[in-house]
């Protein structure tokens, strides 16, 4: 009944930096050709959304943020064959067109149709589907899920198991997949290896789960908040250390803990250049691999001693855990349904959508791992 019509609904809008999101009534236009309109039913509050609000991640405002979600297809535009109305779906901030070099290479996963690099805040045709008070509102990284309805390109949505609980599998849209894949897909952690995970938030805990699933013999959690250690050990960390407890740099501490060898794999899941260097220099000088998972602020630059690379270390970045989104998300949902991994321990708070700013307060204060908002 709503197909082909403008839908009026609630959305949380970021009008300006460092201000609470504002719940407004917006108009959501019908999907154009090759686009899909989705009724969002559950969405997670992620640090990347907070980076936009704080100005660390520069994006055009006003904007509907949110990118980790699950919902049901309301209607589709002309030419869409991958989903139909009524399908349960997850929006994809890392799209998969299947045609570009990254999509066609077995090594790649960052499709050229992504809006991560350009940050245009618009649909592929250069326009928006959102308006509020007569003003055009920007989209966020091909998704925009802090709204009852959103419109995405068909490259940015995938159908999932209809029996999946959306309030849990929404985490597969970003946080869980990013961390789990960093270990399984990007680093390709080997059985018996030693891993160090810097940052034990939701994504960091998902890295821990990935390291455990890959068969790592030691998984060392690193965080300055010792309150996170019990949960990290529950998820698979074999030991946890607080850099503030030591007089020497944390990379030296990790060398001491590994008989002077360094770790096989390290993961920076904070988004700070200082910890990226610490994680990198914690690795075995020749065999070690360090993966940057945390999103750094726009203006950050890294200075390091190139001899650290010369000896043979590998330094890698990773987006969405290295997964090809359309290929991997349905399989990850199926794996969850088959109890191959758990998501419940990552979800510390479930709130109604109207309490979205409370969700961000919990994130900023370090009191939550993941807050899921329910519509």
Swiss-Prot record:
Zn(2+) 1 binds at residues 46, 67, 174. The modification N-acetylserine is found at residue 1. GO terms for molecular function: all-trans-retinol dehydrogenase (NAD+) activity; zinc ion binding. PROSITE patterns: ADH_ZINC (PS00059). It is an enzyme of class 1 (oxidoreductase). CDD domains: alcohol_DH_class_I_II_IV. InterPro entries: ADH-like_C, ADH-like_N, ADH_Zn_CS, GroES-like_sf, NAD(P)-bd_dom_sf, PKS_ER. Its EC number is 1.1.1.1. It catalyses: a primary alcohol + NAD(+) = an aldehyde + NADH + H(+); a secondary alcohol + NAD(+) = a ketone + NADH + H(+). It is found in: Cytoplasm. Binds 2 Zn(2+) ions per subunit. Its cofactor is Zn(2+). Homodimer. Belongs to the zinc-containing alcohol dehydrogenase family. Class-I subfamily. This is Alcohol dehydrogenase 1.
């Amino acid at each position: 009944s709503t197909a082909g019509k403008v839908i009026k609904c609630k959305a949380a809008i970021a009008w300006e930096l460092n201000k609470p999101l504002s719940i407004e009534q917006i108009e959501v236009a019908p999907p154009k050709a090759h686009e899909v309109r989705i009724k969002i039913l559950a969405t997670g509050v992620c640090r990347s959304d907070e980076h936009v609000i704080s100005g660390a991640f520069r994006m055009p405002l006003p904007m509907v943020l949110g990118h980790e979600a699950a919902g049901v297809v309301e209607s589709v535009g002309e030419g869409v064959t991958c989903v139909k109305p009524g399908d349960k779906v997850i929006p994809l901030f890392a799209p998969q067109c299947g045609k570009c070099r990254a999509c066609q290479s077995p090594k790649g996963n960052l499709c050229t149709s992504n809006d991560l690099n350009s940050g245009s805040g618009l649909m592929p045709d250069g326009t928006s589907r959102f308006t509020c008070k007569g003003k055009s509102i920007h989209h966020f990284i091909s998704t925009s899920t802090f709204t009852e309805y959103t419109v995405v390109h068909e490259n940015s949505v995938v159908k999932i198991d209809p029996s999946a609980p959306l309030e849990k599998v929404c985490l597969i849209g970003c946080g869980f997949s990013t961390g789990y894949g960093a270990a399984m897909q990007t680093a390709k952690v080997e059985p018996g290896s030693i891993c160090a995970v810097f940052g034990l938030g939701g994504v960091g805990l998902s890295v821990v789960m990935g390291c455990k699933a890959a068969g790592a013999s030691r998984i060392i959690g690193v965080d300055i908040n010792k309150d996170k250690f019990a949960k990290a050990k529950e998820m698979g960390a074999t030991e946890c250390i607080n850099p503030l407890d030591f007089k020497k740099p944390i990379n030296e501490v990790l060398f001491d803990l590994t008989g002077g060898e360094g770790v096989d794999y390290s993961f920076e899941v904070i988004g700070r250049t200082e910890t990226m260097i610490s994680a990198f220099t914690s690795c075995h000088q020749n065999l070690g691999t360090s993966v940057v998972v945390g999103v750094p602020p726009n203006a950050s630059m890294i200075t390091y001693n190139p001899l650290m690379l010369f000896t043979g270390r590998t330094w890698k970045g990773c987006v969405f855990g290295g997964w090809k989104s359309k290929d991997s998300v349905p399989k990850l949902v199926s794996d969850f349904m088959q109890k191959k991994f758990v998501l419940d321990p990552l979800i510390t708070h479930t709130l109604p959508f109207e309490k979205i700013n409370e969700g961000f307060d919990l994130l900023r204060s370090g009191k939550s791992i993941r807050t899921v908002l329910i519509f």
